[in-house]
Amino acid sequence: MDLRAWTNLEERLGPTVEKLQGRLNEDQQLRAFTETGIKEHVLFGWAAAGHEAGMLCSVGNGRVNIRSGQVTDAAFVLSALPEQWQQFYSSSPEPPFQSYWGMFGQNIHQEGVEVRGKMDLFLALAPIWRRILDLSREAFCGPIEEEGPSNLTTDNLVGRYVYVDLPHWGRTKLFYEQSGDISKPAIIFLHTAGSDGRQYHGVMNHPDMLSRCHMTLFDMPGHGRSFPSETQIPGCHSNNEDAYVGTIAAVIKALGLKKPIVCGASMAGHVSLAVAIRAEEVGAGAVIPCQAAEFTDMERNHWSRSPFINQSLFTPEYIYGMMSPFSPQRERNLVWHTYSGQAFGMYHGDLDFYFGGWDGRGRVEKIDTSRCPVYMLTGDYDWSTTPELSAATARKIPGAKFKKMEGLGHFPATENPSRFVRYLAQAVDYVVEEMKKSP
């Protein structure tokens, strides 16, 4: 299609106004985001960079009205190049065009994408404009064909609490869950920043994993169902490599796990690399880092800690667009839910490790894969830690393996457990065979 058609979004999307308005009126999620006591109407818009003809949306308490027109008077405008909007408005969007957040960027910064106007309103209304853009795409090109969710009817996990003395944080009442065949190789799963172990229920109930491994997950201190440490001050959480690696080592020891495989995504993928570096200290047998790299080199914002932003709304919105648009909606909703339900400061404090607290540059090259095999996995829809970053890290580790996961994003274990297990099972089989060769 001629890109000139996307310079004027008023003309390109204007014919969908009636259809879009109908979807906005009927959408339960949007209603939940807008029936929140909004006192003053906010007008926002989206348009092609350098052009004022676009789409406008007036947001009030329980009411959203859409129209096409000049975006000059909008409080804020979501702007992108014509070719970027063209890719966004696709029934099969390529990464990172599944989300305006992906276009806005971190490690994939899209030149030409910017938010014009009042940034505070852009952040405050993040769940509203995100949902409206999703529905606008649906009105233009139809719904994205997502994969079906898993239909498990039996749960195999057993959960308990254990007191563990942790370096840095001290004595903590931690929650953990286990499933699988105790006679099979042990694997311990680590959740992402600002979330909890519920992320792995789909994986830990999957038949291919139940027959393959003895699986353990635990919630980090103050996350999910784990209690804060006895010294934790509300809002003061901060994570670093020594605290994180020390916690993993302490849990492995407390639960009597024998040379487990350590697997996690995002910050947990980063720490899996740290575990490989310090494998003897931790007692780990192998690692499967997901969505991981030797260093996260990007500018950090502090939106996740601002007292002017509703963290239970903003944090899940910020990470929502990191997932594949083809992942089952029910599973993506679970990711949103777990990120909405954590205590203030936990996500921000975990990012202290993700942003600069982890630095494997000049260190990952020294990982001895004959003693701790490494198999890295990264989903192609992740715009935070991209497959290219993970692959570059894997190439620096002698003997490491890397696989790009098609149709998965930043939260592979949660957003689409069945698809993820196809890759995870291969990784487990590989590292288990390599562990048999370890001295």
Where are these predicted regions, by residue range?
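Feature captures hydrophobic
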Residues: 1-155
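Conserved HGGG/HGGXW glycine-rich cap/lid loop of the alpha/beta-hydrolase fold
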Residues: 168, 172-228
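Active-site loop/oxyanion-hole signature of alpha/beta-hydrolase fold enzymes
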Residues: 216-261, 422
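Flexible "cap/lid" loop of the alpha/beta hydrolase fold
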Residues: 273-314
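Conserved alpha/beta-hydrolase catalytic His-Asp/Glu region
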Residues: 298-299, 312-368
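Short beta-strand/loop motif that positions the catalytic acidic residue
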Residues: 370, 376-378
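Acidic catalytic loop of the alpha/beta-hydrolase fold
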Residues: 380-385
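Catalytic active-site module of serine/aspartate enzymes centered on a nucleophile-bearing elbow/loop
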Residues: 400-439
